UniProtKB/Swiss-Prot annotation:
Gene3D superfamilies: 3.40.50.20, ATP-grasp fold, A domain, ATP-grasp fold, B domain, Carbamoyl-phosphate synthetase, large subunit oligomerisation domain, Methylglyoxal synthase-like domain. Mg(2+) 3 binds at Q820, E832. This is Carbamoyl phosphate synthase large chain. The keyword RNA-binding does not apply. Mn(2+) 4 binds at E832, N834. Mg(2+) 1 binds at Q284, E298. CDD domains: MGS_CPS_II. ATP 1 binds at R129, R169, G175, G176, R208, I210, E215, G241, I242, H243, Q284, E298. Belongs to the CarB family. Mg(2+) 4 binds at E832, N834. Residues 547-929 are annotated as: Carbamoyl phosphate synthetic domain. It comes from Streptococcus pyogenes serotype M1.
Amino acid sequence: MPKRKDIQKIMVIGSGPIIIGQAAEFDYAGTQACLALKEEGYKVILVNSNPATIMTDKEIADKVYIEPLTLEFVNRIIRKERPDAILPTLGGQTGLNMAMALSKAGILDDLEIELLGTKLSAIDQAEDRDLFKQLMQELDQPIPESTIVKTVDEAVTFARDIGYPVIVRPAFTLGGTGGGICSSEEELCEITENGLKLSPVTQCLIERSIAGFKEIEYEVMRDSADNALVVCNMENFDPVGIHTGDSIVFAPTQTLSDIENQMLRDASLKIIRALKIEGGCNVQLALDPYSFKYYVIEVNPRVSRSSALASKATGYPIAKLAAKIAVGLTLDEMINPITGTTYAMFEPALDYVVAKIPRFPFDKFEHGERQLGTQMKATGEVMAIGRNLEESLLKACRSLEIGVCHNEMTSLSNISDEELVTKVIKAQDDRLFYLSEAIRRGYSIEELESLTKIDLFFLDKLLHIVEIEQELQMHVDHLESLKKAKRYGFSDQKIAEIWQKDESDIRAMRHSHSLYPVYKMVDTCAAEFDAKTPYFYSTYELENESVQSNKESILVLGSGPIRIGQGVEFDYATVHSVKAIQKAGYEAIIMNSNPETVSTDFSVSDKLYFEPLTFEDVMNVIDLEQPKGVIVQFGGQTAINLAQALSEAGVTILGTQVEDLDRAEDRDLFEKALKELGIPQPQGQTATNEEEALEAAKKIGFPVLVRPSYVLGGRAMEIVENKEDLREYIRTAVKASPEHPILVDSYIFGKECEVDAISDGKSVLIPGIMEHIERAGVHSGDSMAVYPPQQLSKQIQETIAEYTKRLAIGLNCIGMMNVQFVIKNEQVYVIEVNPRASRTVPFLSKVTGIPMAQIATKLILGQTLKDLGYEDGLYPQSPLVHIKAPVFSFTKLAQVDSLLGPEMKSTGEVMGSDTSLEKALYKAFEANNSHLSEFGQIVFTIADDSKAEALSLARRFKAIGYQIMATQGTAAYFAEQGLSACLVGKIGDAANDIPTLVRHGHVQAIVNTVGIKRTADKDGQMIRSSAIEQGVPLFTALDTAKAMLTVLESRCFNIEAI
């Protein structure tokens, strides 16, 4: 069927900020879809609130709106643009929920707008638990016994009938939010109560638990002519009971017989046809390992995290084709872009194994609840490709960047057998390493299977890895053992460890015997047809399929898996850098390990290597491709950390040189550089042990800010008040980077701002200064940032620009640089300098219109700012006000304290832009879900050092009609100052303590601060977590509360009696 001519203008809804459960895969899907629709000649309108995405670049759609994804704003845009149709299936759960809301509000009918891709009835049937159950019964598809409940009592009655364990799944929530497995009535009551609150329709599904079954996923496509196919089938290493986003996954399925595969395939195709989905769809099934019995778990009627993985695992561009199907094209008339000859109707065939391992944030959140269940906790994931399962698993392990180069954590060798068995049974994020340790200790795989319900096939592969380790131990320097280990994915580093040698010795031994990896192409058809894609993975076999071209090439290192502190912003910079390299006439090569992102889309670069970002893997690509040089400044800390070793191996690092990177990172060198340049910084010292640190703190005076050098996202950074806390910090935190000393700085409590600059070594372009709303002490990634600055005098802005120029030239920066400043008493201090692209690059590029990463790349390749038509110094300011606001995922992470501080905690960001600060703030708060009602009750519980400041806020809240409530100490202080506040009870005082009031909906907002000492107060944490659970706006920094107040006041009319 040819494409539709009756529609011209299509609106695509994006997925908003990155949160746990909805990450960069939707940027990849949305970007592909917009480009595919433009390619077919449609006018595309995009709405998304997340500036850190490629999808919100001007060239991706005809019109791009970076506005809050709320009914109020989307409705306005629709009325302004009048699209003929809306495509909601590429915006994750956010997109689907928005489509449902627009329909319920009558907007779609009113303006005669059609929904493309998936009909509303299908979204309803897949998402509404009752309708889904009815449909499965009609299709004779088995589902676990279940019931829909609207109260906790109904849940208890049902569970008594069918017996425990049961699973609770709230309707219309994302990433299993609010759900869980309950093995007792007590757990059931707690989880159901929370689940009902989180479900927008106040309903939960209670179902019999099938934990322990194999979890299998099918990624399917269907078009309007009812052609349907399976793109990829995937098998979870972990059995049912752990969210698929938190499971290790292999593609294709590894343990199914042909009969089982066909049975589940038929079920998946039957379901997509019954739902009449036009586009992509993901079906999750549970298979009994001991019979042919299976259950359908759930269906996602949209592009999902699994479809991004399936696209990268097979090379089949699901989102692109889904967008074209939505406008009427069919699978049998679209060419598969990978082969360029076969049609999209061909099911991909794989002659390799793909492994995906999730990346968790527990290196940042040491107190977080690490046990895995039906609620997702991973922030990102890595993928690796190999010719056997062992190879792909080990490559994925070393892609994770958690300090391991193998499926082994050395720290586990000291734990007791008892602890080991507990950790093997109760799955945590690192269970793979505990399982491997158990096998090394001689536990039989049969025993482990009965404890974990993980298939023997997988455990046998882990045993095989251990057998190869033992073989290496017995045959040191043996070439055949080396060859075998390399074939199964062992790294040089691991082999060196076993043979007690240096990694370079193993590399030399490989080279002397011509033992190099070859690169195989990902071609969707198991090499049956010729493919034209430049998409490769390494393996130790004979035939190499990647040929060096005769064009000069440049290698760009990506940023690996998404984690807190290193998000999609770095991928954004990577993609832009590649565009500039191609424009300059070079061949652009990307190396990365993250399946969710735009950078690993094979159509972005001239060549893509899907490989771990380790020294060995990068060097292997360099040996083959012989690029002119490598760019490391766009890949976050991941790429910067490789610069030293690559440079020592003789590789040309383009842009800022390694010794200059070192001058910015190494404390003593940095201090020396600042002194030479005459730039003030907070007084500070380095320390390598406890005595030195105490001595430094004594000299500088408390409070001090302590942190390890060479880290990203404020990892292990703390503000310390006294000697005892400093000792405690050194004993627990310094392990963050063993060979580098820690830094002890005077802590200046002032206004913070940051600058991104681009330098060619002689002149420096400063696109803009971003002023932080929160004062120093809150990590820059967690602060709200305003551009252009609203409260900095012209003189201070000039000083900042001057210092930035001096730094860029003094540190020989070529390309990007980020500088953070703190201002106190009109004095500007430099806190830190990062000679690389930072997380503010996409935001600043969008609001200034300067394609910063592209310009930086051109400078790295030898052009000057003057060549490109840019002046030296601060770029003219934008007339609008733009705000970047952080977005957190605390609802997904139990036991993680939501208090803001110097260690970064946000997972994503949104942007609000308008003609005034108040309007821009309003949009930013709406976009990050901090909607505050116009009146209600607000609770203050404030540390002594900020009570005076809180008082003036409380007075302003009262003036606009809020009722003030406060805890004992705060209420007493307010009363002394003439402001009466309702007293709330102490924690544990069942009737009116804060958590109880919050639970009953009596509180609209909470302002809760702790002293500089930031002691982990149990009560405060309970108050904060109750606010997070119930979705009540919580302010842990007075500056944020002040910003919100500004918005409320601007929307308030003055009402006075005459």
